[in-house]
């Protein structure tokens, strides 16, 4: 029982450390160096859950008649 509590605390500490800092827009040098890779967004699990939270009806594709 103590182990599960400890694990939960460490997970909460990780989430606190992963608070996104305000992103400065990349400088022209960085854009020239890395190209489009700055536009690639890393999704957090919460964002993925929100994206996948649509009702099944929307994603359901009815068979052609």
UniProtKB/Swiss-Prot annotation:
Residue spans of biased composition, Basic residues class: 1-10
Biased composition (Basic and acidic residues): 11-21
Pfam families for the chain: Orthopox_F8 (PF05886)
Similarity comment: family membership: Belongs to the orthopoxvirus OPG052 family.
Keyword annotations from UniProtKB, A to Z: Early protein
Inducing stimuli: Expressed in the early phase of the viral replicative cycle.
Signal peptide residue numbers: none
Start and end residues of each stretch annotated as Disordered: 1-29
Protein name, per record: Protein OPG052
